Amino acid sequence: MSYVEVPGAKVPIRMWADPASVEDVAMQQLRNVSTLPWIKGLAVMPDVHFGKGATVGSVIAMQGAVCPAAVGVDIGCGMSAVKTSLTANDLPGDLSRLRSKIEQAIPVGRGMHGDAVDPGKLYGFPTSGWDDFWGRFGGIADAVKFRQERATKQMGTLGSGNHFIEFCLDETGSVWLMLHSGSRNIGKELADFHIGQAQKLPHNQDLIDRDLAVFIADTPQMAAYRNDLFWAQEYAKFNRAIMMGLFQDVVRKEFKKARVTFDPVISCHHNYVAEERYEGMDLLVTRKGAIRAGSGDYGIIPGSMGTGSYIVKGLGNEKSFNSASHGAGRRMSRNAAKMRFSTKDLEEQTQGVECRKDSGVVDEIPGAYKPIEQVIDQQRDLVQVVAKLKQVVCVKG
């Protein structure tokens, strides 16, 4: 579908979804954001739903300002995927050992490594910029510096919620490795600190929604946030890179005889800020549950733990600020999913997938998400499909 413009907004809100299908609270969030004087436009992706801080599946383009609550607490959350030389025929009939080996190599939930991972020992890890990255830790907010040891030990860990690690097959039978994670606790600590700082500023006292508090260009507060934001985004990138290196090491050991090779890793943020230029304006573009889909940009759009995912290539549609959806999008809250579905439902909806099927992940059941095929179809003018994947192993935190 092409986009529709939402009526009654202060600036253009272009929506790649049927407005009638979007919750009223999410529509109100979008209209509230449109009232900010720095806003130049909003794009809304087909996986749109109500979110904390700002609407998930929204792209917020501002000039001279940024809203830290819109970025959210998982700064730099995103996806990584890599195609391997393995095929479905190489996989064992019982995939439980493979799942167990992944869980042993990569801490999940609140877990962390006993010692910081040495990236120099990991297969294919891009060490460029690693030392400089950690050298900048001394320049981030004093309020979180005491978390350095935890930050080093959580580097290369999954977390919980909708974060996952998967073995997938594409339609040709090739095996892909895929994972989803962000900046872990250090990102949350930085986000919480700066959201609190923004809400104290005088120019944010009369907002329609206190979550819309912004930092303004050329102020010390904006400079501090940008520094910490971009550092946390880099943390998330390295976190996924280390996990992918650990994942690849598991695969190489488990399939020694196959002498596995890997294509270049595809990686993309979907909760972040980027400096981009549109219509002659330098803008700060916040993608809150959206990926960059500039012309030729590769991206990853996952479904749920029992449905397909897609590797896509951006078409460079500037009406969407070169963006696309970050996933299928929730059709109900976590609490609603827990009330509606049982572990039996989870078992039925994840048949054929080696994964957890207990009450702790019922809120991640496929039925709690929108149909991924519909979401992809609604953004045919934003991305083209490169590969469709279906998971056979899924590790959740």
Protein language model regions, located:
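Compact, glycine/acidic-enriched structural inserts
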Residues: G78-V117
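Active-site- or binding-pocket-proximal scaffold segments within functional domains
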Residues: L122
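Domain-length cofactor-binding catalytic modules of enzymes
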Residues: S2-Q29, P37-G41, F50-V56, A65-P68, ...
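Glycine-rich phosphate/pyrophosphate-binding loop regions near the starts of catalytic domains
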Residues: V59-I60
